[in-house]
């Protein structure tokens, strides 16, 4: 297609290079006044048909990425030429990050309005202004650019507050031909395949990021800094509604980083309602993701998570203010993997002050994590300095020198020079080639030098570093307020008498039939009966309010002594190891 029909074609993006840090509008403007492409003709034919069918007064374009920008402008251009009475506006991720300093008047030859950040209220006010004739020309607007008296102005004069996340309702897919979309796998990366192979209902657990401190991230913008979680009940209500509307039970939670506590409550709510769903999301590699929590997430239908290991160096992770260490990331990845959840990691190189030694050491960390089987997917990208991140706002603090340009159109990615003087781009091919092999489970024994055509320093990382991180002593501490959840059906019970040295006592064998295995434990008869009676109080489907560890201990000690000896005994540990008992 690219060679013969349209050089700008891409399955998930189109003419992306025109939108990437287009500080000037000239190149895009020139392209918009050149001959229409093959893809343009198809797009505009569909657009014209829809406009004639619906006859709208106002048309909005959501532009999340640079790869959507050209097509949005081409469609808006068509509308202005053929339906000049229709008003057009643009919102979405691209204007939210790139067009906050918009000065280019020619943009308004295509769009009447550009809205920023959460779109519900800005669009509602535009609708009232355009579609209700009784509204005056001086109608208030929310975070909106427009052209007035030949000048680009920004209006934010509405006193109305943005809608709360709980008030937004469920996405409406009613008019989309969901059965006609094709699934395309562009590259062999397991997580990228998951994104595009098949269709996912999109939802958000929380607006913004609960961490909101990473120095490479746009933490000064509302979409990151305004954190507002949604209750688990509302989220699962929306999931049920979407299943009914779309007939599909796959969900992608598109959070910046889903909060672990909320993920737990969502998982419990899914299981209580006995919903059969498949879901995945983005996370931070928090120590809160214990083995038991990961097992619960798996039970609820979680199949994958993606999170940032970034530079895989403790010094740089601290500089980034990521709030994690390589060891912590390794342990969390292990917990997810053992629960049967795929782990994808975002990997970064070229962060300010990063040395060549640290880049190679990062690669060695990644190699070991794939070799240990605790990472299944990853993607290297070179650090980009964005205008709204702490690095972009305070470059001198991070040892970088920005390239200052006059900006009239897009402003996000900033060209810069690192004071180390290292050309980090030279590592790109070697990092990606090695990762491709590691994801296929091969070439772990290859010296790191083989991935690069230039001399690299030898790694200083111990070859067993990740292995040693995962060696840990048995933890005999349980939080007093930890919820105790029983996830299985009741076991089969057989009583028998055990004799030893002239003594006899009553015993019970409890046999558990799980989805993937069958196992048994032996307990003293009276303790087995107590456990069977207690199951109803801690069973997932029986009661919305599970007992916590202290409650369970008190209940046990009404009948027996030494709860800790019972709780950390081999039979009960077997139940924990098989996910029958979870401590959350």
Task: Describe each PLM feature range.
Residues 1-10, 416-584:
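Radical SAM enzyme core and accessory elements
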Residues 1-56, 77, 81, 101-108, ...:
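Conserved Radical SAM active-site core
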Residues 16-164:
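Glycine-rich beta-alpha loop elements in corrinoid/cobalamin-binding modules
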Residues 31, 150-202, 516-520, 577, ...:
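N-terminal [4Fe-4S]-dependent radical SAM core
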Residues 66-70, 96-98, 123, 152-153, ...:
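Flexible loop/turn segments at secondary-structure boundaries
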Residues 111, 275-278, 282-461:
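A structural motif corresponding to the C-terminal lobe/cap of the Radical SAM core domain
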Residues 171-342:
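Radical SAM [4Fe-4S] cluster-binding motif and immediate context
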